[in-house]
Amino acid sequence: MIFHVTLEKAEDGWIVAECPALPGCVSQGKDEKEALENIKEAITAWLWAEDQRAAAALPHEAGVQPIVVSV
């Protein structure tokens, strides 16, 4: 998946990275490279947490089954 992120230099010199498409998905780094690495981890964690939340919201009688789909 492709996400757009914003990078902004904070007053303390750190680079703040945010993914506007994912509310609250923000990270930072000492430089642009580290900020981008960290926001990738934050996006992965955000998506995992959202997946867990969605799965927990399913009715228990829904019968969740994992499947593999090639894209």
Residue ranges and their predicted role:
Residues 23-32:
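A short, exposed loop/beta-hairpin motif centered on an aromatic-Gly-Thr core
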Residues 8-22:
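Short aromatic-glycine-(Arg/Gly/Cys) micro-motifs in beta-strand/loop hairpins
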Residues 1-4, 10, 33, 37-71:
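Short, charged, surface-exposed hinge/linker loops at domain edges
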Residues 19, 25, 46:
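Functionally engaged cysteine thiol sites
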